[in-house]
UniProtKB/Swiss-Prot annotation:
Residues 1-18 have a biased composition (Low complexity). It is found in: Cell inner membrane. The keyword Lipoprotein does not apply. This is ATP synthase subunit b 2. The gene is atpF2. NCBIfam families: PRK09174.1. The lineage of its organism: Bacteria, Pseudomonadati, Pseudomonadota, Alphaproteobacteria, Hyphomicrobiales. It comes from Azorhizobium caulinodans (strain ATCC 43989 / DSM 5975 / JCM 20966 / LMG 6465 / NBRC 14845 / NCIMB 13405 / ORS 571). HAMAP family: ATP_synth_b_bprime. GO terms for cellular component: plasma membrane; proton-transporting ATP synthase complex. F-type ATPases have 2 components, F(1) - the catalytic core - and F(0) - the membrane proton channel. F(1) has five subunits: alpha(3), beta(3), gamma(1), delta(1), epsilon(1). F(0) has three main subunits: a(1), b(2) and c(10-14). The alpha and beta chains form an alternating ring which encloses part of the gamma chain. F(1) is attached to F(0) by a central stalk formed by the gamma and epsilon chains, while a peripheral stalk is formed by the delta and b chains. The keyword Ion transport applies. The chain crosses the membrane at residues 41-60.
Length: 196
């Protein structure tokens, strides 16, 4: 260890000689980067070959096979996913076709049911209308019979009323009562002329 003394230079002259000896042992030249010196090329080439050989061995035996497996797994996974997507798409298209077919069948059934219901309602309506018409015709015929009977009864009373009224008018005008037979024959003649 070198200790600087007071008044002495920090680096003794012997130290310069040692540095000079070190420089001479290193090739006697000052300066220059050792890897660029031609006398070191042989050892550097050997280490270069060893380093690249080890790197090549590690890359070819460890790293590249791993990368290859990873790429192959990714490729297989992508192919599997694409195949599964194709299957799902085919299933989806089949389901859509089945849905459309079922929808078409349901529409056809609904139209058939609606047609049957319309036909049934039309038949029921026709049957009800015919029944109602028959019922109304029967009531109308019965009413016409009653009207005819009432008319005949009323007309038979009209003759009697006409005979009584005519007799009363003749009595009021002439002052003496007319004979029943004369009044009845006059009323019958007037009724016969009116109905003809």
């Amino acid at each position: 260890m070198v200790v600087a003394q007071a008044g002495a230079p920090a680096h003794p002259p012997a130290a310069h000689g040692a540095e000079a000896g070190h420089g001479e042992a290193a090739g006697g030249e000052h300066g220059g980067f050792p890897p660029f010196k031609p006398q070191h090329f042989a050892s550097q080439l050997i280490w270069l070959i060893v380093s690249f050989g080890a790197l090549y061995f590690l890359m070819s035996r460890v790293t590249l096979p791993r990368i290859g497996r990873i790429l192959e797994e990714r490729h297989d996974r992508i192919a599997k996913d694409l195949e599964e997507a194709r299957l799902r798409q085919a299933e989806s298209e089949a389901a859509q076709a089945a849905y459309e077919k079922a929808l078409t069948e349901a529409r056809g059934k609904a139209n058939a049911i609606a047609g049957e219901a319309r036909a049934r309602l039309a038949a029921e309506t026709d049957a009800n209308r015919k029944s109602l018409e028959e019922n109304l015709n029967a009531k109308l015929a019965d009413a016409e019979r009653r009207i005819a009977s009432t008319k005949a009864t009323a007309l038979s009373h009209v003759r009697g009323i006409a005979v009584d009224t005519t007799g009363a008018i003749v009595t009021a005008l002439v002052g003496t009562p007319a004979g029943n037979q004369d009044v009845e024959s006059a009323v019958d003649a007037a009724l016969a002329a009116k109905s003809a």
